[in-house]
UniProtKB/Swiss-Prot annotation:
Transcriptional activator that increases RNA Pol II processivity, thereby increasing the level of full-length viral transcripts. Recognizes a hairpin structure at the 5'-LTR of the nascent viral mRNAs referred to as the transactivation responsive RNA element (TAR) and recruits the cyclin T1-CDK9 complex (P-TEFb complex) that will in turn hyperphosphorylate the RNA polymerase II to allow efficient elongation. The CDK9 component of P-TEFb and other Tat-activated kinases hyperphosphorylate the C-terminus of RNA Pol II that becomes stabilized and much more processive. Extracellular circulating Tat can be endocytosed by surrounding uninfected cells via the binding to several surface receptors. Endosomal low pH allows Tat to cross the endosome membrane to enter the cytosol and eventually further translocate into the nucleus, thereby inducing severe cell dysfunctions ranging from cell activation to cell death. Through. GO terms for cellular component: host cell nucleolus. Its main location: host cell. Residues 1-33, 78-130 are annotated as: Disordered. The modification Phosphothreonine is found at residues 85, 89. This is Protein Tat. A motif (Nuclear localization signal, and RNA-binding (TAR)) lies at residues 78-90. It comes from Human immunodeficiency virus type 2 subtype A (isolate D194). InterPro entries: IV_Tat (IPR001831), Tat_dom_sf (IPR036963).
């Protein structure tokens, strides 16, 4: 007598077991929840000092402090570069009294000296003779 061939039972068992897709979905949902919690924890953590002085796009988004400093272009600290000279210090030399007023005020138009030419004297002389 021949023994009948048995069908593999594993194929039937796979239909009865829950699919692995649902377990993968649960794992990814848990990972996302953990990432969200880590991000919230990082937001509430005080900012650490960053010594990166480059202003390229990659370095601007390096960390939260770099983004606040470089990415937004807003700087809340005092900047020493824009200091003006104190008012007590005189930047201009005292005006000399022998100079004319136009020279002190800085008129850019020079005064023209009129030269008498023989033609103008001849014309006026002819006018008197008539």
């Amino acid at each position: 007598m021949e023994t009948p061939l048995k069908e593999p039972e594993s194929s039937l068992e796979s239909y009865n077991e829950p699919s692995s897709c649902t377990s993968e979905r649960d794992v990814t949902a848990q990972e996302r929840a953990k990432q969200g919690e880590e991000l919230l924890a990082q937001l509430h953590r005080p900012l650490e000092a960053c010594t990166n002085s480059c202003y390229c796009k990659q370095c601007s988004y390096h960390c939260q402090l770099c983004f606040l400093k470089k990415g937004l272009g807003i700087w809340y600290a005092r900047q020493g570069r824009r200091r003006r000279t104190p008012r007590k210090t005189k930047t201009h030399p005292p005006p000399a009294s022998d100079k004319s007023i136009s020279t002190r005020t800085g008129d850019s138009q020079p005064t023209k000296k009129q030269k008498k030419t023989p033609e103008t004297t001849v014309v006026s002389a002819c006018g008197l003779g008539h």
